[in-house]
Amino acid sequence: MKKTIFAFVVLGIMAIACNSPKQKELAKADLPSAADRIERGEFLVATLGCNDCHSPKVMTPRGPVPDPNRLLSGHDSNETLPEYDPQSVGGYVLFNMNGTAAIGPWGTSFAGNLTPDATGIGFWSEEQFVKSIKEGKYKGLDNSRSLLPPMPWEGYSKLPDEDLKAIYAYLKSIKPVKNIVPQAILPGI
């Protein structure tokens, strides 16, 4: 009988200890805040080079830099691509001056608008964003085409989900830019 009472007392003490406010505070401390998540996302966007393709550029004395008024807004819908001779560029990949459009064996691809505007990722869910990177799906939709080169989604797909969610949080926090990016031009079309 004493052993049974002792066992219940020990179990009771353990239950109280495991559910103490201190434990709950420690668990909450382990979760990153929204600000921490956005800061992590900003760091990842900068180090992964997202601006290289997704931001129109302005020319400076040091060369082209991302246009601060159009950061991550993708290929400018008002920009026309120059003419080129497909025969003379044979085995090459061409980029426009902004780096937001690329021509290759896959056709012509245009960097997407990653801002939270409705013309960008404004209506995307976090799950869609993660799926687009993890599985290379256009707009993160199951029955959509694959993301086109030069988007290096295969490499980025190895990022932990928490990093992709941090990138998403950062992108949702930046200035929205209205810009409807042209559809890809696939070969033979």
Locate the predicted segments by residue.
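Bacterial signal peptide processing site
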Residues: N19-K22
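C-terminal capping alpha-helices of c-type cytochrome domains
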Residues: F123-Y138, W153-P182
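Surface-exposed aromatic
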Residues: R145-E154
